[in-house]
A protein has these predicted regions:
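Catalytic cores of nucleic-acid endonucleases
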Residues: 145-187
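Active-site ExK catalytic segment of metal-dependent nucleases
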Residues: 136-148
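Short acidic, glycine/proline-enriched helix-loop-strand junctions
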Residues: 118, 176-202
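Residues at the C-termini of beta-strands that transition into short coil/loop
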Residues: 49, 73-75, 121, 144, ...
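Conserved acidic residues
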Residues: 129, 138, 163
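Accessory nucleic acid-recognition modules appended to NTPase machines
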Residues: 1-128, 132-135
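An exposure/low-complexity boundary signal
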Residues: 131, 202-203
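A structural signal for isolated positions on well-ordered beta-strands in alpha/beta enzyme cores
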Residues: 118, 139, 166-167
Length: 203
């Protein structure tokens, strides 16, 4: 129970990685292994594993100890954070958790289409929220609550080949062939997730 109640706090850290010490001082990840497994099987939480630098397929976690937990119900995220759900959309500038809220939303939509969750971290602060494998091709997903920059995608491309990247944000649908970047609004992610799952993804 204490694990479940602290998930949004885990995501609100700078690294977002699961940190057992945040729940109980001196505790280890293995102390929560059974709880995480049970909550994942019950679809109460969704587990995303870290990938580093150069990625090989099929996608496999670089380490079982580096992962993140997302809440399986986006409404529960709002409840745990104590922030009105409407503020995540209407007043996002004043809501420091809005970026995490949207990441949690995308994670749930990917899980709904039976994708396994992975995220990428470079040696610096570079990070991409989700990496999807479809038809032996990589599709990095960058989740932005605003316009944001593409620094992480540029660093990712230095180490990995990908079909094209997908930026999920509030912006309108569009495609930049030079950057191989498809931009989609948040409401479109269920359709993209399905196409990736079916292996029918096209621009």
């Amino acid at each position: 129970r204490v694990l479940f109640q602290n998930i949004y706090r885990e995501l609100n850290k700078e690294s977002k990685n699961f940190s057992p010490g945040l729940i109980e001082e001196k505790s280890k990840t293995r102390d929560y292994a059974t709880s995480i497994q049970w909550l994942t099987m019950a679809h109460v939480v969704n587990q995303s594993f870290q990938l580093k630098e150069h990625i090989t397929m099929p996608l496999m976690p670089d380490s079982e100890s580096n992962f993140r937990l997302f809440l399986g119900d986006i409404g529960m995220f709002s409840y745990q954070s104590g922030i009105n759900a409407a503020s995540f959309v209407s007043n996002e500038r004043d809501n420091t958790l809005s970026g995490i809220f949207f990441e949690n939303f995308v994670a749930n939509e990917l899980i709904a289409k039976e994708h396994k969750l992975f995220y990428w971290r470079g040696r610096t602060s570079a990070e991409l929220e989700f990496i999807i494998e479809s038809n032996n091709k990589l599709y990095p997903l960058d989740v932005k609550k605003g316009r944001g920059t593409l620094n992480s995608l540029e660093k990712f491309s230095n180490h990995n080949k990908f079909e094209y990247a997908i930026k999920v944000s509030k912006n309108n649908y569009g495609y930049n062939p030079e950057q191989r970047l498809l931009t989609i609004p948040f409401y479109f992610i269920p359709f993209i997730a399905k196409d990736l799952a079916d292996g029918t993804m096209t621009i």
